[in-house]
């Protein structure tokens, strides 16, 4: 455990951020799975939005976001 006050604060913040990031990533995955289970335009927009939000917050790389959205759009087109 950290002894210095600033290190203690950073450790607490890291725990909070980890929970927040995990929740955001989980929401993205849930939106993608919902679309894959029942491909529709509405679910595609929701999944695409969730992917964009995760990319903006730095949870996933921009290339992964682009790749994921491209794969979803091909599933929608079929």
Curated annotation (Swiss-Prot):
Entry keywords, A to Z: Ribonucleoprotein, Ribosomal protein, RNA-binding, rRNA-binding
Pfam families given in the database record: Ribosomal_S20p
Gene3D superfamilies, per the entry: Ribosomal protein S20 (1.20.58.110)
Coiled coil: none
Keyword Acyltransferase recorded: no
Entries under InterPro entries matching the protein: Ribosomal_bS20, Ribosomal_bS20_sf
Function: Binds directly to 16S ribosomal RNA.
Name the record gives this protein: Small ribosomal subunit protein bS20
Gene that this sequence comes from: rpsT
């Amino acid at each position: 455990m950290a002894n210095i006050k600033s290190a203690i604060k950073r450790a607490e913040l890291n725990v909070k951020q980890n929970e927040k990031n995990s929740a955001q990533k989980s929401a993205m995955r849930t939106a993608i799975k919902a679309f894959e289970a029942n491909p529709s335009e509405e679910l595609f927009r929701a999944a695409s939005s969730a992917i964009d939000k995760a990319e903006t917050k730095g949870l996933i790389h921009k290339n992964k976001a682009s790749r994921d959205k491209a794969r979803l759009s091909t599933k929608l087109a079929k």
